[in-house]
């Protein structure tokens, strides 16, 4: 899996800061603080400044400086850097970003957001603030069609998961997101908001990929580093026990243990993957937390030769972890393109009888339950709106043509085994470059069914975002 670092510099005229007494009513760091049609707060909480990105969007950026006088305000240019990393999950790429600073956990929880049954019921899902800023600062300024601009603005408000793919993201993105949600809930959000987070930092991560580049190696204290990462997540989640938190656990990892044990890196990582996944499930077993282990997708573990070994593996992990209450089930189609339910199988799925996620889950669940794991499911539909896609083969994962934004996140799935349809991967970040001379070039990104020309993995891919937007089903 390629890991790409992108420095995004934001610089614009900073707005004057309000007096301290008013800041409790201001937007949090990374929150929106202005723009055409925006009716929310136009000031920022202490430590950040409202910076205009374009006519449609102003954002609270940390560390911005502003000087004021009694009659006028003089704005200085502010630059905020964020590290951006990308990860290939189930044959495609997902993105997560982190500010390069550490924040202090404000206050403490006075209640516990415990739940019974489906953790997606009785809550609202939180829209990813960084993805919102990407859409408003990178996508919308390049769109001239007013209707498409309005549609893009609507995409920015769709709740999506936040990825913790490096240790630095724990004390930055996780704390900031939970702080923002706490503030919104304390301000009277009804129903309250819940957080959606991806735990994703195993050593020797994504073992079957052509160019894995996670931050830790098993041979270099990786297991202990990962336990520290999980321990810190646990500490923060306990501090925010008033915020219900839904976790996807380690995309690709266990699925690779089913199908890719012929890959030396995977066979070498197998025992560590199992040990650390069990460690994470035990440590994050908290009353306000719900966990879903990643279980690939219909075109991966859904094949008849793979589905029973997959059931055996996931049930064994669940049992060895002590059947934690917070382990609700499995996540499928993470960062992929598969339909939830389609009337006839696309040609590229043949001859798999489980040609969509519904068939996969309905075949998978009884096998799991028979082994003591009555798993519920969540299904990523962020890029699954257009069916069939333009893929020539099911394994063609990179920037697939003919895709669109899919059904919006909801707990109203109409299916007894499915807790929610979700957007684990927000659309618009590139899966990989089509430049054959690039160091991170993967041949999948140069295939005829991959959209080209494509920038490096993790960079904003405007043409792909607009493809998803134009093909969205339902439309925005």
Curated annotation (Swiss-Prot):
Q: What PANTHER family does the entry give?
A: 1,4-BETA-D-GLUCAN CELLOBIOHYDROLASE C-RELATED, PTHR34876
Q: How does it associate, per the subunit comment?
A: Monomer.
Kindly list every residue the record annotates as glycosylated. 144, 153, 167
List this protein's GO terms for biological process: cellulose catabolic process
Residues reported in the UniProt entry to bind substrate: 163, 165, 297, 300, 336, 397, 425, 429
Instruction: Identify this protein by name.
Output: Exoglucanase-6A
Family affiliation:
Belongs to the glycosyl hydrolase 6 (cellulase A) family.
Q: Cross-referenced InterPro entries, in alphabetical order?
A: Beta_cellobiohydrolase (IPR016288), Beta_cellobiohydrolase_sf (IPR036434), CBD_sf (IPR035971), Cellulose-bd_dom_fun (IPR000254), Glyco_hydro_6_CS (IPR001524)
Q: Quick one: where's region Substrate binding loop 2?
A: 423-461
Originating organism:
Humicola insolens
What ranges does the record give for the region Substrate binding loop 1, renumbered to this chain?
200-222
Pfam families of this UniProt entry? CBM_1, Glyco_hydro_6
Q: Which residues form the CBM1 domain?
A: 33-60
């Amino acid at each position: 899996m390629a890991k790409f670092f992108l420095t995004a510099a934001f610089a614009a005229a900073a707005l004057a800061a309000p007096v301290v007494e008013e800041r409790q009513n201001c937007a949090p760091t990374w929150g929106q603080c202005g723009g055409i049609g925006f009716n929310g707060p136009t000031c920022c909480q202490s430590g950040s400044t409202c910076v205009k990105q374009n006519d449609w969007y102003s954002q609270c950026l940390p560390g911005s400086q502003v000087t004021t006088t009694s009659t006028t305000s003089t704005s200085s240019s502010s630059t905020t850097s964020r590290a951006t990393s990308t990860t290939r999950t189930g044959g495609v790429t997902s993105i997560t970003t982190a500010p390069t600073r550490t924040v202090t956990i404000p206050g403490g929880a006075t209640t516990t957001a415990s739940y019974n049954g489906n953790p997606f019921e009785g809550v609202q899902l939180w829209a990813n603030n960084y993805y919102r800023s990407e859409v408003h600062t990178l996508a919308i300024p390049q769109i001239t069609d007013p209707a498409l601009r309005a549609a893009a603005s609507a995409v920015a408000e769709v709740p999506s998961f936040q990825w913790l793919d490096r240790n630095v993201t724990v004390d930055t993105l996780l704390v900031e997101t939970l702080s923002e949600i706490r503030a919104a809930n304390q301000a009277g959000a009804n129903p309250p908001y819940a957080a959606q987070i991806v735990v994703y930092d195993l050593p020797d991560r994504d073992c079957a990929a052509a160019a894995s580049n996670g931050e830790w190696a098993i041979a270099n204290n990786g297991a202990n580093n990962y336990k520290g990462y999980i321990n810190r997540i646990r500490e923060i989640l306990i501090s925010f026990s008033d915020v219900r938190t839904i976790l996807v656990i380690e995309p690709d990892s266990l699925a690779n243990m089913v199908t890719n044990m012929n890959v030396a890196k995977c066979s070498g990582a197998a025992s560590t993957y199992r040990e650390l996944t069990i460690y994470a499930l035990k440590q994050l077993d908290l009353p306000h937390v719900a966990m879903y282990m990643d279980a690939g997708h219909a075109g991966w573990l859904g094949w008849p030769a793979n589905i029973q070994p997959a059931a055996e593996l996931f049930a064994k992990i669940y049992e060895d972890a002590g059947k934690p209450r917070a382990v609700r089930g499995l996540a499928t189609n993470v960062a992929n393109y598969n339909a939830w339910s389609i009337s006839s199988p696309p040609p590229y799925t043949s001859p798999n009888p489980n040609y969509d996620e519904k068939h996969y889950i309905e075949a998978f669940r009884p096998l799991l339950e028979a082994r003591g794991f009555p798993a519920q499911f969540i299904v990523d539909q962020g890029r699954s709106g257009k069916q069939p896609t333009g893929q020539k083969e099911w394994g063609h994962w990179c920037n697939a043509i003919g895709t669109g934004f899919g059904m919006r996140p909801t707990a109203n799935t109409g299916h007894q085994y499915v807790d929610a349809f979700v957007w684990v991967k927000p659309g618009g970040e590139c899966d990989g470059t089509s430049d054959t001379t690039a160091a991170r070039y993967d041949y999948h990104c140069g295939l005829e069914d991959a959209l080209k020309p494509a920038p490096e993995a993790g960079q904003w891919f405007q043409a792909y975002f607009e493809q998803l937007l134009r093909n969205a089903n339902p439309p925005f």
